Amino acid sequence: MIIVTGGAGLIGSNIIAALNDMGRRDILVVDNLTDGTKFVNLVDLDIADYCDKEDFIASIIAGDDFGDIDAIFHQGACSATTEWNGKYLMQNNYEYSKELLHYCLLREIPFFYASSAATYGDKTDFIEERQFEGPLNVYGYSKFLFDEYVRQILPQATSPVCGFKYFNVYGPREQHKGSMASVAFHLNNQMLKGENPKLFAGSEHFLRDFVYVGDVAKVNLWAWQHGISGIYNCGTGRAESFEQVARAVLNYHGKGEIETIPFPEHLKSRYQEYTQANLTKLRAAGYQAEFKSVAEGVAEYMQWLNRKS
């Protein structure tokens, strides 16, 4: 069996889709469907069972036996960088992850988890080491703290423990994220309403590493298949502008022009203006596949979003 936490979310559901493509159906999905809209991400996927997150955590703490587990992909967390309830975030993103990590270590189950480029804050080197990290929000801090915990444990681990610092992930199965969904998703919705795509003023200067979710799923499965341990960046290695994202959306629709709107005051001091994954460590570990550019990834995503049902 393979367990995917956050399996109804963006990255988790795409990992399940990739596992299905490999012929794996023996998948236990763990998630919190309080937001019932997320179920649509699972409708076309083949899984063995579903477990509520709270029930799963209780079982993990109790040390319950789930049978033979080939791997756990831990993608379940509060992913809202705008969430400021520190107690909630630390319970969801830190304490929960520690419990699951120790469950896996004790049973030598390969453990692959979601870290985040938010751990870097406004640093500009994006190298997977403590001195290059400085989160700007409590979400980033919760991820940073778990990375630090893993770094202490890795030398003694006898089974794979691998974290990926996800950069700006976009692609199919993110509609449930609302305001936290990708720029490409929101711009497409604006176009469907007959509006022009809107970007914050100055967006042509904001450069981000936008990584297609299908590529993220591939990296996770590669790490599992090769028994990889460590903490790695997961991005394209390219910094591209929000304007390039908008251009890709416009190219798909074949009409419209970019409009600018004022930049929100409350985001100014907490906004990463530049991200670009340093892939040196990932490449050294043996991952050689290419990552889609914004032009390639957004074009594929637009086809998926606008497919005929």
From Swiss-Prot:
Keywords: Carbohydrate metabolism, Isomerase, NADP. NADP(+) binds at residues 10-11, 31-32, 38, 53, 75-79, 92, 143, 169, 177. Pathway: Nucleotide-sugar biosynthesis; ADP-L-glycero-beta-D-manno-heptose biosynthesis; ADP-L-glycero-beta-D-manno-heptose from D-glycero-beta-D-manno-heptose 7-phosphate: step 4/4. Disulfide bonds: none annotated. Substrate binds at residues 168, 179, 186, 200-203, 208, 271. The active site is at residues 139, 177. Its cofactor is NADP(+). Binds 1 NADP(+) per subunit. Its EC number is 5.1.3.20. One of its GO terms (biological process) is carbohydrate metabolic process. GO terms for molecular function: ADP-glyceromanno-heptose 6-epimerase activity; NADP binding. Contains a large N-terminal NADP-binding domain, and a smaller C-terminal substrate-binding domain. Catalyzes the interconversion between ADP-D-glycero-beta-D-manno-heptose and ADP-L-glycero-beta-D-manno-heptose via an epimerization at carbon 6 of the heptose. Homopentamer. Belongs to the NAD(P)-dependent epimerase/dehydratase family. HldD subfamily. This is ADP-L-glycero-D-manno-heptose-6-epimerase. It comes from Histophilus somni (strain 2336) (Haemophilus somnus).
